[in-house]
Amino acid sequence: MFIQDDIKENLPLFLVELYHRTQGDASVKVSMFDIGESLGLDRKLSLRTAEELIGTGLVEIKTLSGIIGITTEGVTEARQLGASLKNEKEFKI
């Protein structure tokens, strides 16, 4: 089914965008729909992608209205995918 393929394709992009929006801080809350919109996803695909990441423990649901946060495992995974924050790059030698 093409939706499942779309979800798999967008998982790393969604996680990295969440990492950037939260600055890797698990206490920061953002809308899954705003993240999806920035990636060109509709609300349904944003929801399904977020649910997939929630199921893996990389993202956690904060409110029933679509507010999510990244977990410490999600931060680790995003970094393994190549995500970094501007200030992290500045301090690397």
Give names to the regions the model predicted.
Residues 63-80:
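Accessory beta->alpha helical hairpin/"wing" motif in late/C-terminal subdomains of nucleic-acid enzymes
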Residues 16, 48-51, 76:
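Generic structural signal for well-ordered, non-membrane alpha-helices
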Residues 54-65:
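A short, conserved structural fragment
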Residues 75-93:
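Short, amphipathic alpha-helical interaction segments positioned at domain boundaries
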